[in-house]
């Protein structure tokens, strides 16, 4: 009971692709899905590890692991903000995310992720380690069904997001993400080259 969300994993010469088959999602209760997070801890790094994330903020930016800036993390819609999305989500944006990509550099290992399906319905999140979560991690979150959410008790220790309205229409685009492993000692230059050659 609950939800069935089919995900297909496939390997190619580029790397590994994870695809959510939206037409086969089943909702078996009165509760419905609004957003889907895909592989949130893929490439996560502990507090002891050295590295950075590359995010598509403008033409690209680097977020160093364990940098102490733990308040909101990085949150950005791919390409631009949807005018129908919540004002609270829009307020966190910095530059427009111009490319559907993000990168992970962890010690000697590096990978580039390319969002290959559902990019315009995707929001990218990145967080560095803190007292609550001892990991540095980055992930895409896709909007399966649009909704309106308000923040309640935002100036307290226990703020709540309350969903007021959800649309019946769901996304008919499969959400897909390609992880491309890079050569040893790959860095942000190698990530840019891999995306250019993709």
Residue ranges and their predicted role:
Residues 1-198:
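Carbohydrate-recognition beta-sandwich/jelly-roll modules
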């Amino acid at each position: 009971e609950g939800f069935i969300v089919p995900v297909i994993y496939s390997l190619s010469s580029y790397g590994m692709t994870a695809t959510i088959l939206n037409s086969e999602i089943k909702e078996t209760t009165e509760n419905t899905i609004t957003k889907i997070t895909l592989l949130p801890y893929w490439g996560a790094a502990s507090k002891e590890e050295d590295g950075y994330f590359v995010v598509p903020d403008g033409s690209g930016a680097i977020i160093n692991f364990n940098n102490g800036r733990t308040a909101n993390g990085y949150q950005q819609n791919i390409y631009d903000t949807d005018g129908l999305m919540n004002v609270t989500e829009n307020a966190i944006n910095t530059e427009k995310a111009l490319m559907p990509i993000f990168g992970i550099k962890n010690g000697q290992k590096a990978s580039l992720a390319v969002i290959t399906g559902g990019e315009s319905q995707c929001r990218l999140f990145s967080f560095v380690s803190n007292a609550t979560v001892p990991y540095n991690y980055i992930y895409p979150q896709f909007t399966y069904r649009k909704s309106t959410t308000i923040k309640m008790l935002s100036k307290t220790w226990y703020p709540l997001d309350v969903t007021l309205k959800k649309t019946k229409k769901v996304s008919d685009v499969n959400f897909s993400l390609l992880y491309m492993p890079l050569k040893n000692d790959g860095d942000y230059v190698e990530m840019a080259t891999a995306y250019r050659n993709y």
